[in-house]
Design a protein with these regions (language model features):
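Chalcogenol-based redox active-site neighborhoods
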Residues: 5-165
């Protein structure tokens, strides 16, 4: 397992199951917080697809949220499609209820679709077990990168390496 696939969640180290580089992007078809349905193949015209497992309640996502939004603004005009997916059970995490996801996306002006994985089937297909969990797929929708956004989740002023830089 690469270090990029390891995350501290609470006080426990949680590892996402690495998809091997070159693995095809798992298929998905999910409803977004705005009521539209999006599918993996609906982004075919984009040369890259960035799938981000995120949510509202996670302090690690909250810490990098503005950087995720900046990535969407930076890469969107370059025809890179970013997609956020929340796979949490809202019964366990009330902040991740659809209406709260929608409110957060509007409040923060997410520049990407924010999808709801109600069954967690998509998260399982990706092997995503924590947030944020970032997957970058190339034009052929083969995995090119899996890991973090940068090297300091807590303090953007202390970032020395941006893994998702052009």
């Amino acid at each position: 397992m690469s270090a990029a696939g390891r995350y501290l969640v609470g006080m426990a180290l949680t590892e996402s199951k690495d998809l091997a580089l070159g693995t095809p992007c798992p298929d998905f078809r999910l409803r977004s917080v705005d009521g539209k349905t999006y599918a993996r193949d609906g982004f075919r015209e984009k040369p890259a697809l960035v799938v981000m497992f995120i949510c509202n309640h996670c302090p690690y996502v909250q810490a990098v949220e503005d950087r995720i939004i900046a990535l969407a603004r930076e890469y969107g005009p370059r025809s890179v499609q970013l997609v956020g997916i929340c796979s949490n059970d809202p019964t366990d995490y009330p902040d991740d209820r659809p209406e709260r996801l929608r409110a957060r996306a509007r409040e923060k002006r997410y520049g990407f679709p924010y999808l709801i994985d109600e069954t967690q089937d998509v998260a399982r297909a990706f092997g995503a077990v924590c947030t944020p969990d970032i997957y970058v797929f190339d034009r052929d929708r083969r995995l090119a990168y899996h890991g973090r956004i940068d090297d300091n989740w807590n303090d953007p002023k202390k970032v020395t390496r941006r893994e998702l830089a052009a």
